[in-house]
């Protein structure tokens, strides 16, 4: 495969923490825990960029600002794990890689659509049957945290009700519906 060699064990020449599986087009990522012999398996991915993003999330969680990242300009958009447990780091890394893959697919699909839009407008028999690709908008628009945010909202106490005065109706007008029929 281009970009790897047998001499370096399948490691990617550009991305840290990424290597290619033997006899496969899949890329894997793992990271060693600081000051421990343990490794955290981050997953198997279809592209080296997805594996590199997963590595970045884990490196940032484990090493903080001292981490050497593959994509240092994307630090602000990377998800942070909920805790320092390997399972949470794996989940955050997988989420970031999936979001990167979905965003990449959306960009490729948009580019393909813009290139064919001129032809499609001229061809009246064109239909959208070639649009069979799936794009997970939840990952593209950072929606995995929506349920957690909604749950946090449920923990808030509701606003206090205002004191209801019997002389005023719900709209704040005196005398209920009498204001409709009071003419000077």
Swiss-Prot record:
Belongs to the AP2/ERF transcription factor family. ERF subfamily. The lineage of its organism: Eukaryota, Viridiplantae, Streptophyta, Embryophyta, Tracheophyta. Its main location: nucleus. PANTHER family: AP2_ERF DOMAIN-CONTAINING PROTEIN, DEHYDRATION-RESPONSIVE ELEMENT-BINDING PROTEIN 1D. InterPro entries: AP2/ERF_dom, AP2/ERF_dom_sf, DNA-bd_dom_sf, DRE1A-I. GO terms for biological process: defense response to fungus; ethylene-activated signaling pathway. Residues 1-21 are annotated as: Disordered. This is Ethylene-responsive transcription factor ERF024. One of its GO terms (cellular component) is nucleus. GO terms for molecular function: DNA binding; DNA-binding transcription factor activity. The gene is ERF024. Gene3D superfamilies: AP2/ERF domain. Probably acts as a transcriptional activator. Binds to the GCC-box pathogenesis-related promoter element. May be involved in the regulation of gene expression by stress factors and by components of stress signal transduction pathways. SMART domains: AP2 (SM00380). Residues 14-72 bind DNA. It is found in: Nucleus. Keywords: Activator, DNA-binding, Ethylene signaling pathway, Nucleus, Transcription, Transcription regulation.
């Amino acid at each position: 495969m281009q970009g790897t060699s047998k001499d370096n064990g399948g490691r990617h020449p550009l991305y840290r923490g990424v290597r290619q599986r033997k006899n496969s087009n899949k890329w894997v990522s793992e990271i060693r825990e600081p000051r421990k012999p343990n490794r955290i398996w981050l997953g198997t991915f279809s592209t080296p960029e997805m594996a590199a993003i997963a590595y970045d999330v884990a490196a940032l969680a484990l090493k903080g600002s001292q981490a050497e990242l593959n994509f240092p300009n994307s630090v602000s958009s990377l998800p942070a794990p909920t805790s320092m447990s390997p399972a949470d780091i794996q989940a955050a890394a997988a989420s970031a890689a999936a979001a990167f893959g979905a965003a990449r697919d959306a960009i490729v699909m948009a580019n393909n659509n813009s290139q064919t839009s001129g032809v499609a407008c001229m061809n009246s028999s064109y239909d959208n049957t070639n649009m069979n690709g799936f794009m997970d908008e939840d990952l593209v628009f950072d929606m995995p945290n929506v349920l957690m945010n909604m749950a946090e909202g449920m923990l808030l106490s509701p606003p206090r009700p205002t004191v209801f005065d019997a002389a005023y109706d719900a709209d704040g007008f005196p005398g209920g519906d009498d204001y409709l029929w009071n003419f000077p």
